[in-house]
């Protein structure tokens, strides 16, 4: 079985998220999504509209996702690749090069994001330009 993993906050779930998950799942047989915990979001200075359990429930309801695990810190990725016997590590292209250190353990792919949509864009359109 070919295992794929990706990471994210997945707040204000939108079609760009779904498209990324669909494309990631097409790269293997089993998709693991490491979802940022509320505590990790605080460390990253991010505020989510939905809490971890709500975001997890939404991700688990998506047919492309096989397993949702908590992402608790920056250094977790290498451990996850080994623990879950990951074949393909997928991130959005805005992270290009950041995870190349994993290439000796698995294939690393940076996917182009869906144009015209992002959580930040949604928040800014709803709440004004200062929203993040």
From Swiss-Prot:
It holds the Pfam family CTP_transf_like. SUPFAM superfamilies: Nucleotidylyl transferase. Keywords: Cell wall biogenesis/degradation, Cytoplasm, Nucleotidyltransferase, Teichoic acid biosynthesis, Transferase. It is found in: Cytoplasm. CTP binds at residues 9-10, 14-17, 46, 113-120. InterPro entries: Archaeal_FAD_synthase, Cyt_trans-like, G3P_cytidylTrfase, Rossmann-like_a/b/a_fold. Pathway: Cell wall biogenesis; poly(ribitol phosphate) teichoic acid biosynthesis. Gene3D superfamilies: HUPs. Catalyzes the transfer of the cytidylyl group of CTP to sn-glycerol 3-phosphate so the activated glycerol 3-phosphate can be used for teichoic acid synthesis, via incorporation into both the linkage unit by TarB and TarF. Homotetramer or homodimer. This is Glycerol-3-phosphate cytidylyltransferase. It comes from Staphylococcus aureus (strain NCTC 8325 / PS 47).
